[in-house]
Amino acid sequence: MSKLIKLTSITAVSSTLAASYYFYFVDRDGFHYQNSQWKKIGDKVQGIIDGSENINPSTPSNSNQVIVVKRPMTETMKDLWNEQIRNTANWFYSWGK
């Protein structure tokens, strides 16, 4: 009985692999394979290696830049302290409402 189960499981796995291979690579002239991201990247890399395709350098846009302001740590701590004081005062005053 165990040989029958083993044979059935091997047949099921083999059939599943064969069907997935057929539908991915063969059916509709390999539509899914030709349009896959891995294939496109592989073709682009192969073109760069062969010299038939150029690398287009990207130019950074100025609109996405973030301005960073460096502040002393004491100012940041003062801001955090003041925020906590304001929140505590609002909490106390909310009792009277």
Curated annotation (Swiss-Prot):
The keyword Mitochondrion applies. The keyword Mitochondrion applies. The chain crosses the membrane at residues 7-24. GO terms for biological process: cristae formation. GO terms for cellular component: MICOS complex; mitochondrial crista junction. It is a single-pass membrane protein. Keywords: Membrane, Mitochondrion, Mitochondrion inner membrane, Transmembrane, Transmembrane helix. It is found in: Mitochondrion inner membrane. Belongs to the MICOS complex subunit Mic12 family. Component of the mitochondrial contact site and cristae organizing system (MICOS) complex. Component of the MICOS complex, a large protein complex of the mitochondrial inner membrane that plays crucial roles in the maintenance of crista junctions, inner membrane architecture, and formation of contact sites to the outer membrane. This is MICOS complex subunit MIC12. It comes from Zygosaccharomyces rouxii (strain ATCC 2623 / CBS 732 / NBRC 1130 / NCYC 568 / NRRL Y-229).
